Amino acid sequence: MKKIWIGMLAAAVLLLMVPKVSLADAAVGDVIVTLGADLSESDKQKVLDEMNVPDNATTVTVTNKEEHEYLGKYISNAQIGSRAISSSSITIAKKGSGLNVETHNISGITDEMYLNALMTAGVKDAKVYVTAPFEVSGTAALTGLIKAYEVSSDEAISEDVKQVANQELVTTSELGDKIGNENAAALIAKIKEEFAKNGVPDNKADIEKQVDDAASDLNVTLTDSQKNQLVSLFNKMKNADIDWGQVSDQLDKAKDKITKFIESDEGKNFIQKVIDFFVSIWNAIVSIFK
């Protein structure tokens, strides 16, 4: 059975003790790395080598006590666990480049889930990497990544936005267990796109309609409980100080990256290889009955 919530909870608060960095000090390529306090020396070196951390990177440590302090509002103490082991890094990218997320040994949170929640929090133009020395769920990485971005860019993110972004990640992960990770991430992104493009709904009833419409468009079936969970999340988003213009911009950049990849020689070759693979399987099946 998949371990949900355990392990990557460290990364949620990994950067809470990062020394203040001024905007004048931040530059393209600057890196902040977070390490769990309970990593063994060998595991610590393993993740540092994996992330290819430069000598001038800011590195901080987080304790399990800090994990409980910042995550206890959303999940139980048992789910948070007793060890801080996860790691992450955020690298400042050039203006207008958008967000890029990559993960390793993360079983419960997809790249798209992190991308969605980071957009909500106002994080932009950064390369994000989340990892652990062994497989963990990854739920806790967001808070640390937000803090890393905040201190390196000198852009304060309001507490209500941080809270709703963390709630979004938890909600998407839980929903992903029921309807599939891709469906959950796509559904959240579609509803947010409606908020960003057409304006924040005036009331709860309008939010319910947007949830229903998005689920219908994506051919996703939701239970009443799942629908209520989403309505609750987006009702909080409605009241949070979210920069929806920036969310829209980051969503557009993410779409542009996908489109450019598909249209590139690399993307076309990849798609052709996928097609060839399934054709070969089909031909093998057909040959059995000849």
Swiss-Prot record:
Main location: membrane
Annotated keywords: Cell membrane, Membrane
Subcellular location: Cell membrane; Membrane raft
Keyword Cell wall biogenesis/degradation belongs to the record: no
Induction comment: Transcribed under partial control of SigM ECF sigma factor.
Stored InterPro entries: DUF1002 (IPR009343)
Entry GO CC: membrane raft; plasma membrane
Protein name listed in UniProt: Uncharacterized protein YpuA
Species: Bacillus subtilis (strain 168)
